[in-house]
Amino acid sequence: MKSGGIGEILFLCHRIPFPPDRGDKIRSHNLLRKLCEIAPVHVGCFADDARDMSFATELGDISASQKIIPRNNSRVLAGLKGLANGQPMLVALFDHPVMHNWVREILAARPISAVVAYSAQMAHFVPVLEEGKRFVMDFVDLDSAKYTAYGEGQGGPLGWINRREGRVLLDFEKAVAVRANVSTFVSEAEASLFRAVSGLSTGKVRALENGVALDYFSPDAQFERLSPEERGTGPLLVFTGQMDYRPNIEAVDSFARISMPAIRDAHPDARFAIVGRSPTAAVEALASLPGVTVTGAVADVRGWLAAADVVVAPLRIARGIQNKVLEAMAMGRPVVASAQASEGIDVQWDRHLLVASNAGQEAALVLKLLADKQLSADLGKAARARMVERYDWSATLAGVPALIGG
């Protein structure tokens, strides 16, 4: 044991927490490293593809043991299974008998004192625990609210599916939270929302905020800068994110089609770079619009962030704390974000970042920054200072030992 009274830890997460290069993996990776400071950690997780599986060695270097299962469940089949079993589709999509068996074996064979489940779809792998073992449920975001938002005003079968998922998933989340010793969310706003819909107390539902790797995401760090050809000569606006994720897709579509024409009226050479892996066909099609570039996966996002005149985060549906916003601010870049993308981040609007209520205002605020270099520089400097002051991972995860120890 590394800490008095704490045995070993079982950590369950829906994607292998390596490498920390997308939102869900960034949090799970840093949480895992914090848990490893407390006690030996056994990790059960899924791999989306061969690239995920290739990081098994890195995971093995820090875990006491591991179980990585390739995930190939069909969304259609998972949806049908969920309907048949009364499960949320999200849970059915990650169900696997091998993971259930492995969890039971680890609990029987090892002196596990705490089980940490990361994201709602891993909660169903946690059985009823023996007295004295703690169950910490890190929901991260209130996923049911996201599906409810998808379904609002949406007609046809897809609208029905999303509304049904929102209802069933919320019931599941509430049942899990009742069973867990404590449930955590990425921001106090998310935690407060869940307390309101579940009726649970602050002792049962708490905030566990995201952080940012300040040495890595730093304007002074060593990284490859964009070439002059990549950078171009005009104003560069950048969005970063996983580009097969619906909120990101909708965000860049809106900015490219509505905000960019207004910006290019004033700056005909302005470019909008959509930076992130797995762009869908709809995202790739945006590259046909004037001034829009779709990069796909890049080796190091910091080069694009450092080159950006403005980083934009025009999300309309957003839960919790957006890593993309923290990273841009840590790089000292001026950020224009929607209210949804900035919600939950402990900053002052107009001092640390600019916040827009619609696509037209996003364009206006970008143009304001492009016209006032001093304002842009001051905003970036204040953004970096706020990240250093408030969002170092060591500070945001400082309460984890108490959650594990009870």
Locations of regions flagged by a protein language model:
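Nucleotide-activated donor-binding/catalytic signature segment of Leloir-type glycosyltransferases, i.e.
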Residues: 65, 267-303
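Acceptor-binding helix/loop patch of EC 2.4 sugar-transfer enzymes
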Residues: 14, 73-93, 133-174, 192
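A short, well-ordered alpha-helix in the C-terminal region of glycosyltransferases
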Residues: 375-389, 399
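Conserved acidic donor-binding segment of nucleotide-sugar-dependent glycosyltransferases
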Residues: 353-360, 368-374
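Acidic donor-binding loop of glycosyltransferase active sites
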Residues: 181, 291, 306-320, 331-334
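Acidic anion/phosphate-binding donor-loop and adjacent secondary structure
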Residues: 148-149, 195, 212-228
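Carbohydrate-associated surface elements
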Residues: 189, 208-211
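Short hydrophobic beta-strand element within catalytic cores of glycosyltransferases
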Residues: 324-327, 334-338
